[in-house]
Amino acid sequence: YINYKNMSHQHLLTLFNLLPVGSNISTWWNFGSMLLACLMIQIITGFFLAIHYTANINLAFSSIIHLSRDVPYGWIMQNTHAISASLFFICIYIHIARGFYYGSYLNKEVWLSGTTLLIILMATAFFGYVLPWGQMSFWAATVITNLLTAIPYLGTTLTTWLWGGFAINDPTLTRFFALHFILPFIIISMSSIHILLLHNEGSNNPLGTNSDID
């Protein structure tokens, strides 16, 4: 029983905790909200990292070392961004596993929009991995982008276009930084569509419990 008369005098977080939710929704339904929280953390920390980052092959690694050592609380921003990225993928894989288990793929529009979100997220993570321009960043950029050459007829042209030349160089890093910056905002837009499609048909009873239990 919720006493709505006293709700206005309570703390905001307490109000959220008191929001009525059906008993047929379990802990597995938390991960969509956690993904949104991860996205917000990534955008906020990423903004502060972008302020100090230099998209140049000669300065990129040094700018990150400067961020870690010289910028006040820069190391917190960098580590939070990295750890939250890992948490992002843990949450999304659990979110997808929940969808497989409860047959959410039958809702085709929601499932396909979610699949698109996963692909965009993986691309964003790849572009971010390249940005420090360390040895592994260079290797990743070379190997992954070279996969485009497997496309018949257009492969070599597409790879050259993506690199901004005939080899991975400064233009590659610049456009990867631009893509890494813009894609999270596309993810926000796609997430909104994902949620709209989810609520388009109304709710269901995935756990199969008594709908009158509450």
From Swiss-Prot:
GO terms for cellular component: mitochondrial inner membrane. CDD domains: Cytochrome_b_N. Heme b b562 binds at residues 81, 180. Binds 2 heme b groups non-covalently. Signal peptide: none annotated. A ubiquinone binds at residue 199. GO terms for molecular function: metal ion binding; ubiquinol-cytochrome-c reductase activity. Heme b b566 binds at residues 95, 194. The keyword Electron transport applies. The chain crosses the membrane at residues 31-51, 75-96, 111-131, 176-196. It is a multi-pass membrane protein. Pfam families: Cytochrome_B. Heme 1 (or BL or b562) is low-potential and absorbs at about 562 nm, and heme 2 (or BH or b566) is high-potential and absorbs at about 566 nm. Component of the ubiquinol-cytochrome c reductase complex (complex III or cytochrome b-c1 complex) that is part of the mitochondrial respiratory chain. The b-c1 complex mediates electron transfer from ubiquinol to cytochrome c. Contributes to the generation of a proton gradient across the mitochondrial membrane that is then used for ATP synthesis. This is Cytochrome b. The gene is MT-CYB.
